[in-house]
Curated annotation (Swiss-Prot):
<feature type="binding site" description="axial binding residue">
    <location>
        <position position="81"/>
    </location>
    <ligand>
        <name>heme c</name>
    </ligand>
</feature>
<dbReference type="GO" id="GO:0005758">
    <property type="term" value="C:mitochondrial intermembrane space"/>
</dbReference>
<dbReference type="GO" id="GO:0009055">
    <property type="term" value="F:electron transfer activity"/>
</dbReference>
<keyword id="KW-0679">Respiratory chain</keyword>
<keyword id="KW-0007">Acetylation</keyword>
<dbReference type="GO" id="GO:0046872">
    <property type="term" value="F:metal ion binding"/>
</dbReference>
<comment type="similarity">
    <text>Belongs to the cytochrome c family.</text>
</comment>
<keyword id="KW-0249">Electron transport</keyword>
<keyword id="KW-0813">Transport</keyword>
<keyword id="KW-0349">Heme</keyword>
<keyword id="KW-0408">Iron</keyword>
<dbReference type="InterPro" id="IPR036909">
    <property type="entry name" value="Cyt_c-like_dom_sf"/>
</dbReference>
<dbReference type="InterPro" id="IPR009056">
    <property type="entry name" value="Cyt_c-like_dom"/>
</dbReference>
<dbReference type="GO" id="GO:0020037">
    <property type="term" value="F:heme binding"/>
</dbReference>
<protein>
    <recommendedName>
        <fullName>Cytochrome c</fullName>
    </recommendedName>
</protein>
<comment type="function">
    <text>Electron carrier protein. The oxidized form of the cytochrome c heme group can accept an electron from the heme group of the cytochrome c1 subunit of cytochrome reductase. Cytochrome c then transfers this electron to the cytochrome oxidase complex, the final protein carrier in the mitochondrial electron-transport chain.</text>
</comment>
<keyword id="KW-0479">Metal-binding</keyword>
């Protein structure tokens, strides 16, 4: 898969203003991502999701994140996430490798 260290840099630059990853981390504009892998969309406790996100019904994993992170609004029309996406597959792979590591601690 990707490079965790490169993924961490991408997370800090593109994601950390809205998301946290650590266990017990606060929700910001976006939900805390701890425990993301294996969780269904719209399920982080205490975060107010759109119906579109709650009703998508997919389980987050490498494949679903690879598609979602390319174009979030295309993957979940109606999501609140204002991020345009990451076009480079290698950058998405790095970010996913980091998220897989950082959200499981």
């Amino acid at each position: 898969m990707g490079d965790i260290e490169k993924g961490k840099k991408i997370f800090v630059q593109k994601c950390s203003q809205c998301h946290t990853v650590e266990k017990g981390g606060k929700h910001k504009t976006g939900p805390n991502l701890n425990g993301l892998f294996g969780r269904k969309t719209g399920q982080a406790e205490g975060f107010s999701y759109t119906d579109a996100n709650k009703n998508k019904g997919i389980t987050w994993g490498e494949d679903t994140l690879m598609e979602y992170l390319e174009n979030p609004k295309k993957y979940i029309p109606g999501t609140k996430m204002i991020f345009a996406g990451i076009k480079k597959k290698s950058e998405r792979a790095d970010l996913i490798a980091y998220l897989k590591d950082a959200t499981s601690k």
